[in-house]
């Protein structure tokens, strides 16, 4: 009798899945590449079609503390929308059991243009990226199996997974795909700088002068329009003896990559401080000052472009900071589409 009941239950499950699949009509979304921007190096949605249902599921997961061990550290705890999905005013990420990481949380936008992620490039696909913080003992400190168990007892998730993927199965692949759809949709291309480029606004005199300085002194690494060339470079920061963070060399094992870190985008830089891979600098003026006088030119792996440091006047420095603030995308910072769901 028990066997018959088991067969009946399994049959019902299969019928339920078939019924849901027959009703699977997702709302497909297009991924916008702004005019004049390069094509992304890879199509992150090629095997993970972007849908409204997948996006909404990914957003719910992104803000859900149950992805962490104690429920207190969702992805959004370190990637806050008002800080361009970086961590506002915190040098290091704060995680489970009152732990801290040894790096500053990078901003999450325009990820479709990144072949490698993290300061050392240790992640090479957006669908893999969430695994690192979820399983890191100093961040979310959870294992994927337990995350899935917690999600599986929530009927809302059953409905959302079915809407996004065609049936109620909740597994790691689908969870990561949904997160990738949400994170990959976070784009920044609506700053004053972008409006100026489209002829919809004008720089002030100070901003225009700062832009000229930027083009002459900074654009080689922070290349427009992404304001990064996505390379890894040693920018002359002294090695913190406690952190002993060797940067890219931790991934490649190559001495030539010692102290090299990913060049961050300068978009939204007004709101993504503190700055550098370890958050050691707390103002844009101090960032510029580092390139003027703080570079350790004795380092053998120092990027050649920085050997002569940055030579600019005090007024050029002020104007440069004024220009950098035109890269703030207020649309992104306040877009209700990316807000925490109810």
Which residues make up each language-model segment?
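Sec-dependent N-terminal signal peptides
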Residues: 1-4
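Periplasmic c-type cytochrome electron-transfer domains
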Residues: 12-342
């Amino acid at each position: 009798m028990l066997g018959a009941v088991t067969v009946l239950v399994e049959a019902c499950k299969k019928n339920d899945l078939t019924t849901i699949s027959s009703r699977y009509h997702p709302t497909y979304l297009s991924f916008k590449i702004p005019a004049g921007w390069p094509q992304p190096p890879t199509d992150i949605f090629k095997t993970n079609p972007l849908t409204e249902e997948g996006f909404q599921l990914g957003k719910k997961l992104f803000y859900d503390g149950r992805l962490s061990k104690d429920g207190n550290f969702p992805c959004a705890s370190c990637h806050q929308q008002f800080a361009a999905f970086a961590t506002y005013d915190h040098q290091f990420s704060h995680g489970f059991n009152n732990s801290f990481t040894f790096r500053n949380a990078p901003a999450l936008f325009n990820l479709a243009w990144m072949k490698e992620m993290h300061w050392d490039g240790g992640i090479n696909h957006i669908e893999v990226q969430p695994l690192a913080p979820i399983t890191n003992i100093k961040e979310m400190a959870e294992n994927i199996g337990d995350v899935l168990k917690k999600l599986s007892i929530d009927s809302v998730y059953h409905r959302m997974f079915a809407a996004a993927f065609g049936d109620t199965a909740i597994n790691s692949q689908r969870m990561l795909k949904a997160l990738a759809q949400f994170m990959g949709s976070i784009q920044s291309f609506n700053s004053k700088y972008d409006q100026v480029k489209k002829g919809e606004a004008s720089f002030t005199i100070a901003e225009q002068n700062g832009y000229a300085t930027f083009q002459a002194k900074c654009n080689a690494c922070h290349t427009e329009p992404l304001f990064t060339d996505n390379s890894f470079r040693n920018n002359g920061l002294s090695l913190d003896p406690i952190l002993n963070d060797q940067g890219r060399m931790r991934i490649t094992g190559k001495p030539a990559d010692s102290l090299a870190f990913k060049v961050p985008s300068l978009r939204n830089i007004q709101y993504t401080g503190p700055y550098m891979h370890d958050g050691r600098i707390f103002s844009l003026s101090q960032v510029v000052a580092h390139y003027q006088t703080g570079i350790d030119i004795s380092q053998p792996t120092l990027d050649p472009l920085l050997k002569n440091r940055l030579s600019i006047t005090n007024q050029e420095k002020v104007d440069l900071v004024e220009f950098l603030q035109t890269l703030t995308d207020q649309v992104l910072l306040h877009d209700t589409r990316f807000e925490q769901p109810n």
